[in-house]
From Swiss-Prot:
It is found in: Host cytoplasm. The lineage of its organism: Viruses, Riboviria, Pararnavirae, Artverviricota, Revtraviricetes. Keywords: Host cytoplasm, Translation regulation. Belongs to the caulimoviridae viroplasmin family. InterPro entries: Ribosomal_bL9/RNase_H1_N (IPR009027), RNase_H1_N (IPR011320), RNase_H1_N_sf (IPR037056). This is Transactivator/viroplasmin protein. It comes from Cauliflower mosaic virus (strain NY8153) (CaMV). Residues 486-520 are annotated as: Disordered. GO terms for cellular component: host cell cytoplasm. GO terms for biological process: regulation of translation.
Amino acid sequence: MENIEKLLMQEKILMLELDLVRAKISLARANGSSQQGDLPLHRETPEKEEAVHSALATFTPTQVKAIPEQTAPGKESTNPLMASILPKDMNPVQTGIRLAVPGDFLRPHQGIPIPQKSELSSTVAPLRAESGIQHPHINYYVVYNGPHAGIYDDWGCTKAATNGVPGVAHKKFATITEARAAADAYTTSTQTDRLNFIPKGEAQLKPKSFAEALTSPPKQKAHWLTLGTKRPSSDPAPKEISFAPEITMDDFLYLYHLGRKFDGEGDDTIFTTDNEKISLFNFRKNADPQMVREAYAAGLIKTIYPSNNLQEIKYLPKKVKDAVKRFRTNCIKNTEKDIFLKIRSTIPVWTIQGLVHKPRQVIEIGVSKKVVPTESKAMESKIQIEDLTELAVKTGGQFIQSLLRLNDKKKIFVNMVEHDTLVYSKNIKDTVSEDQRAIETFQQRVISGNLLGFHCPSICHFMERTVEKEGGSYKVHHCDKGKAIVQDASADSGPKDGPPPTRSIVEKEDVPTTSSKQVD
């Protein structure tokens, strides 16, 4: 019995100490302590300690009685049997540097900011220089005159503005600044209104409504001058004018010097064939189509090895592309075989008035074997503007020589012939008469002293030497007003009716009648 009374007394003492600890905790919370447990538990006042000791000293087992259960909190302490301190009743206690806010528990990561991970830096070096990366480039087109004159940034709109309109002048520029300067210079010189910039999507190249179409002035028909022939019932439909901007001298010199300086580093889709005065480009698979087009317009291509989808030549003239496609589908059994385009071309010629000669090409198409590129070497480039004419004369002679060699080939199939382009391929059968006439017609139109847009005595002398090697006679007496007066020694004795049996064919305006010995 005494043991029970002692235990009850100890329980009472512990309850008193527990009340003291709770009081200290409440005081610490009220004072906003920064960290729990920073302040040590201090002893109570001497008066309270004396009360505890006196109670223990005067305690006797007979005085211990069971304490009735309290149903309500007392004045000095709470009922230990009631849950008076629940999590929802607890005041937030500062336990860290960041203030604890109840709303933070509803935020992601309880309101704690998560630092972003830094991007992993790649240690893999790029295979090619950043300058070699191709970026999209927008060209600007100036339509100087016509019903839709203006500055365009889309070739589709420019083509619609110039297609079928006679006398329209237009030009391509790399930047809007250059285009604006050229347009302002033109309007100032012609004293016309300033040309507006027409972005893509805003060009109104057709009537806006049916009423406007009815009120629009009718299109003037071309005046026909007939001499003894019946006028056609309707005007012929205008042919589609494909946009082929004239190459400038600056563009040509840039490509020329690029070919001379190229050493094969940085681009494995190109290699050059270097001669003493000129370097020609050879384009392999995945070459830049825009560069192929510009080099083609400059007459600086020797060979093209296109992919199966012909993406490298997609900017070449449409008829040339169609001829290549027909060769793949109709002339070879395995359409997956690689092909080549071997080009012999002249180069452009400029005078003070501007461009006087666009390159003329003879293109051979064939099945390509394994491509073994030649080593590209950086060559010395000393050419000046005044040397371009001499270079054009040299390439013109080589062009005529390669064109005359077609007469020695007995098995040729003509894929396409145009005013300034001849495309052919080898054939397993002999050349038919139709293809032979096409070659002769092209030679008649191209081979002359005026090949380069002006009369050139050097071309005439080259033709004279070439004809003499084949047993003919071709003499140039003198040049009068830019035209060569040419007379064949055997012209007087030959028949006057019908075409002369000649292999060296000259343009009709330069040679009234020519004849030479036919060499088999």
